[in-house]
Amino acid sequence: MLKASGLHREIKGQWEFVALTKNDPQGILPVWREMTRFIFGETFEPRSVQELFHLLNMPPFGITDGVLPVLLSVFLIVYQNETTLYREGSLLPEPTIADWEVLLRRPELFSVAGCKITGARQAIVERFARGYQTEPAVMPVVRVLIRGLKSLPEHTWRTNRISKYAQEVRATVDQAKSPERLLFSDLPLALEMEPFEDKRLDKDKVEQFFARLNSALTELSNETPRLLEWGRDEWLAACGLGKGEDSWNLFCTIAIDLAPHVTNSNLLPLLKRAAESEDGRTALESVLAYIANRPYKNWTDIDTDVFSEKVSIYAKAFRAAQKGYVPEASLSHEQRIQSRAIAENLRQQLKKAKLEDPQVLRVALQMLLQEMTDEHEPKL
């Protein structure tokens, strides 16, 4: 049927689904035109798939139940940039095979909508499309927008410690019912602006809209990475090691040296996570998860508060272990004399260097220690 009607045809060596524009041997053109009229109505409101199927069942069309879903799927493929499918009122940016299987059995659960954007609204879509590097049509833009936010970690979706605009944009996208309404009405309202009407384009309004939207989206995108850095610096500060990546590397070096000598059953697993992980990032994620008893990407605001409370407890244990650890304990009497002489020599050299920043001194010593460790590692 699809080939005979011309809906599926070969174009330049490739088979494609195309819209019908002239009479065909199968008499599908009137059906296609009725589907176009039904789906591309005067409003953006979705219309019932069951209602569409009932309409096409009746004279003068008389399309059988088995053919109806096939025609609908072809129609949505041909007009994929201008149509949307809904399941129980929820937008399906990218319908799956499972969705279509349900539609075959329960068409009453689904609705469909279509729109052709022109005028000022088209300029808005084109601006989105340039930023997302996608086709200048509503559905491709909305798909990228929703996919980007849905891919963010659980923490970003659950925290309320973000700006008002970021919270509103997140909720608006999550509850989107219509792609057209999302772009031209719901998102502007979420950003405390008037909806975009299909009339003369107000460039200042457009710039303000995208400035607020981009700020909110950037904040959402950066929220979980920000949390990781915050957790790292909270822990380091409590341990008296400063802040930043260099200080974290210093902590990991200390953990390697300290772990074999620690007996505190609560602190030891934390030190082992820092000492035995493959890299600094993995070690950091593992340590934060241990302190809060949950991976940081899944933290709620309550988990963040729990982490803050526990940090001081673990840091106190760390400082006590560090203070009680005597590196010379494993050395012979002769080795102790040698190590003290070297330490005194280094102390005098550092005094001559007149280093006033303790952070610089710690990092320098850490680098030297790492080089010495690397030199004595067995070569494979």
Model features per residue range: what roles?
Residues 1-23, 78, 112-380:
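Long low-complexity, intrinsically disordered regions
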Residues 27-28, 46:
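Intrinsically disordered, low-complexity, polar/charged repeat-rich segments
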Residues 30-34, 53-93:
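Charge-enriched amphipathic alpha-helical scaffolds
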Residues 34-42:
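Solvent-exposed, amphipathic alpha-helical segments
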Residues 43-56:
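Short acidic, hydrophobic short linear motifs in intrinsically disordered regions
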Residues 64-70, 82-89, 100-108, 154-160, ...:
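Short, charged low-complexity intrinsically disordered segments located at boundaries
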Residues 84-131:
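C-terminal engagement modules used by replication, chromatin/transcription, nuclear envelope/ESCRT
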